[in-house]
Amino acid sequence: MKNLATVEDTLTSWPQVLLNTYGTPPVELVTGKGSTVTDADGNVYIDLLAGIAVNALGHAHPAIIEAVTTQLSQLGHVSNLFATRPVVEVAAELVQRFALDDATIASQTQVFFCNSGAEANEAAFKLARLTGRHRILAATNGFHGRTMGSLALTGQPDKRIPFAPLPSGVEFYPYGDLDYLTTLVESDPTDTAAIILEPIQGETGVIPAPEGFLTGVRELCDKHGLLFIVDEVQTGIGRTGDFFAHQHEGVTPDVVTMAKGLGGGLPIGACLATGEAAKLFGPGKHGTTFGGNPVSAAAARAVLSVIDEEFCADVARKGELFAEQLRGVAGVADVRGRGLMLGVVLDQPVAKQAVTAGFKHGLILNAPADNIIRLTPPLVITDDEIRDAVRALAAVLAELNA
């Protein structure tokens, strides 16, 4: 057996052998349990990022460990030329969670599995084009991925411009502006295929859609025969206190994309379609080698077995506790979001410095903007961990604002 390459120091070797897409990380994490992680020097942190909203059940959750270990010992990968039970069970459960026990909706809903949120949005993009119409309307500041198709849907010029020309036919509307969106649709309704949005924009600072906006978009799509695509990659799987964030308004999209928390740390994404949208794909129209891998599907099945209605209600409660505690911290101007997807708006542009200072105070933070800290902790975070995190963040901000 060949001796594998040896690495003397992880952080020193990182920039030598990995393409410079992320810069060099500040710490090397080696273990995790629940809502905490430990670095190579033994420092313990409360993880308020959860792998960017991925580790819904935290680190080393026993249900995921058991499911993955059992499945991998039986069958690891076979491709979609063959059926495996885990993928069918996960699809059936997602259909039920989407349909909210409406048998008619459930009977018209199907799922495509892939590996990530970007791939799920690529599938949604292709569904929209299969309607025979060309235009897709996406929100300014929205984020749907970094592959070429999902990047075309992303309303952030700094991410788009270096890779032009992107797939054509995407036009942008101000997020939350229903009047502008209506005018844009009605400028060419017969060539407009779909409207895509996130219920809460995460990458630009945790910005919820205005109340009633999703309902208005649903009505606009119904009027003109458009697909309503909701990107739940970051907001879905219980993150906001509802299983899907769009359920907060009681709307039913035509297409829902998801990933991140679905696998609880293993790579799996999904594009769910209902009604006429579910009839657009046929054999050969789309595919993926690893999508629906039985090991990732087993992990997703374990996640879904834990995240039930009672669990989601507790996420909502913990989110309210977190927000209430944060609003009392000096240096915090506002807290927005729902459930355990929160944007902490600071009264000074020190969010990026807070991320760095957070390590010294035992916190893993994320700053999508100069004055915003994004919090997406594991959904299993405890009340005591929330209070400890708020105290630590208060110390960070006091230090920076001194």
Curated annotation (Swiss-Prot):
N(2)-acetyl-L-ornithine binds at R146, T288. One of its GO terms (molecular function) is N2-acetyl-L-ornithine:2-oxoglutarate 5-aminotransferase activity. InterPro entries: AcOrn/SuccOrn_fam, Aminotrans_3, Aminotrans_3_PPA_site, Class-III_PLP-dep_AT, PyrdxlP-dep_Trfase, PyrdxlP-dep_Trfase_major, PyrdxlP-dep_Trfase_small. GO terms for cellular component: cytoplasm. SUPFAM superfamilies: PLP-dependent transferases (SSF53383). Pfam families: Aminotran_3. Pyridoxal 5'-phosphate binds at G117, A118, F143, D231, E232, V233, Q234, T289. Keywords: Amino-acid biosynthesis, Aminotransferase, Arginine biosynthesis, Cytoplasm, Pyridoxal phosphate, Transferase. It catalyses: N(2)-acetyl-L-ornithine + 2-oxoglutarate = N-acetyl-L-glutamate 5-semialdehyde + L-glutamate. It is found in: Cytoplasm. PANTHER family: ACETYLORNITHINE AMINOTRANSFERASE, MITOCHONDRIAL, AMINOTRANSFERASE CLASS III. Homodimer. This is Acetylornithine aminotransferase. It comes from Corynebacterium efficiens (strain DSM 44549 / YS-314 / AJ 12310 / JCM 11189 / NBRC 100395). The gene is argD.
